[in-house]
């Protein structure tokens, strides 16, 4: 256990194009091997494509997609006596946003479209409409928490 306490959260700068911290977080999640300009090109291209498909502000579409992907409950392992129980716990808001972005980017990487821009754009559009693999992941997480509701009294 560190004696200094938790490291302070570093401030997140707003995105220069859309002026949104969510877009900055999305760029950082897409980022691989330090290639930030490539990550920005992918995210901006995907948001432009989402704008072309919907005709609305892409940041609003992204927020709607994240609201459909953010988990409310998750399960955490808790060892009690010799058994390990999956205990359902509520997800903190910052963690739910991080998980939603991670799932959105992860499942867009697994899609079949040709370029990453198309994959990310289509996953964002699917998620904003309540479809897609990332929304299914949220439903599975909630189902798991519901199935293990009997162990909710082990919360910490």
From Swiss-Prot:
Where does this protein have coiled-coil stretches?
Answer: none
GO terms of biological process kind: translation
Q: InterPro entries, per this entry?
A: Ribosomal_uS7, Ribosomal_uS7_bac/org-type, Ribosomal_uS7_CS, Ribosomal_uS7_dom, Ribosomal_uS7_dom_sf
Q: Does the keyword S-adenosyl-L-methionine apply?
A: no
What Pfam families does the record tag this protein with?
Answer: Ribosomal_S7 (PF00177)
Alphabetically ordered keywords of this record: Ribonucleoprotein, Ribosomal protein, RNA-binding, rRNA-binding, tRNA-binding
Annotated GO molecular function terms are:
rRNA binding; structural constituent of ribosome; tRNA binding
Return the GO cellular component terms, semicolon-separated.
small ribosomal subunit
* Keyword Cell cycle found: no
The family assignment reads: Belongs to the universal ribosomal protein uS7 family.
| NCBIfam families referenced in this protein's UniProt entry, alphabetically | rpsG_bact
Functional note: One of the primary rRNA binding proteins, it binds directly to 16S rRNA where it nucleates assembly of the head domain of the 30S subunit. Is located at the subunit interface close to the decoding center, probably blocks exit of the E-site tRNA.
Which proteins does it associate with, and in what oligomeric form? Part of the 30S ribosomal subunit. Contacts proteins S9 and S11.
Q: What is this protein called?
A: Small ribosomal subunit protein uS7
The lineage is: Bacteria, Bacillati, Actinomycetota, Actinomycetes, Mycobacteriales
């Amino acid at each position: 256990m560190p004696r200094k306490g938790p490291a302070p959260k570093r401030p997140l700068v707003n995105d220069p194009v859309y002026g949104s911290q969510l877009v900055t977080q999305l760029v950082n999640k897409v980022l691989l091997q330090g290639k930030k300009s490539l990550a920005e090109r992918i995210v901006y291209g995907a948001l432009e494509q989402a704008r072309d498909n919907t005709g609305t502000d892409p940041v609003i579409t992204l927020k709607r997609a994240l609201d459909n992907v953010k988990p409310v409950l998750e399960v955490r392992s808790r060892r009690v006596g010799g058994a390990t129980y999956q205990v359902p716990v509520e997800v903190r808001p910052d963690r739910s946003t991080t998980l939603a972005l991670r799932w959105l980017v992860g499942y867009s990487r697994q899609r079949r479209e040709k370029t990453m821009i198309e994959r990310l754009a289509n996953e964002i559009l699917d998620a904003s409409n309540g479809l897609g693999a990332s929304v299914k992941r949220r439903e599975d997480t909630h189902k798991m928490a519901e199935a293990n509701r009997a162990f909710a009294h082990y919360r910490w």
